[in-house]
């Protein structure tokens, strides 16, 4: 094709474009009305977003005599529904089903275990309903509850929570439960933010689980290199009418981390902690991953030990992970070692 022939094609396209422009000017009002209707339809079609997650996990525990080890394979399916209420408010729901390999019955129950609204009241962000409550890595609290979250700020955020345990919470391993149960109440206040290479948080917890408990948490993370981070936390707790130790700590390293959208990405982490029973409520480590290394949390006065883990993105939206826990009671000679493995699919 010669340049002249190409120029003729361009000239015809420009002429048609000019005709379209003239027609658009002539029917501007009608097109505007049509545009409003089309935009409204597009907005309506995007009003609800549905996503999902499927996780297959296996837990293998080796614990002292008398401790329920909890070895099991589990297939957990979650469907998330997020809808727009208006320009300022959204609704989020989560349906969950669990299938276990260590029983011979069908696990057909599907539970709606998230149901909350999110929005702003003035400059304050608010979430209200049934949802997960966790912060600062979940080393004190990582549980589901019915309540409200309030937060204010950008780089430095102040937050307050009030919640009670929902009726579908799992029980702790062992004969003495140290997890949140239906109706247990927890109140949290804190401040946190990012200051250069350091992120820090200070939190206060007040709970009526087992007995009245007050916990102060100071946590910080320092970026040592591009993907390497040093984490640490100090805890001071007071469990009413007990003479348990009051001070605990955690120190750890984190390197990078698997990203579901980036094939081949990976990460490693390692933590060591010493946690008297007065310094935690429902930590992430004991909320289903590791077997608690005691039969009675008071006699054991909590736990100490280390946790290591790794994750790797096998394919887009498919991430494999492994965790190993070696924990022992702070008092007595009970212990528990747990190997947790999982593959997570998101869609």
Locations of regions flagged by a protein language model:
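Outer-membrane beta-barrel pore domains
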Residues: 2-3, 17, 22, 38, ...
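N-terminal periplasmic/intermembrane-space "pro-region" immediately following the signal or transit peptide
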Residues: 1-55
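Outer membrane beta-barrel
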Residues: 3, 47-60, 66-201, 221-222, ...
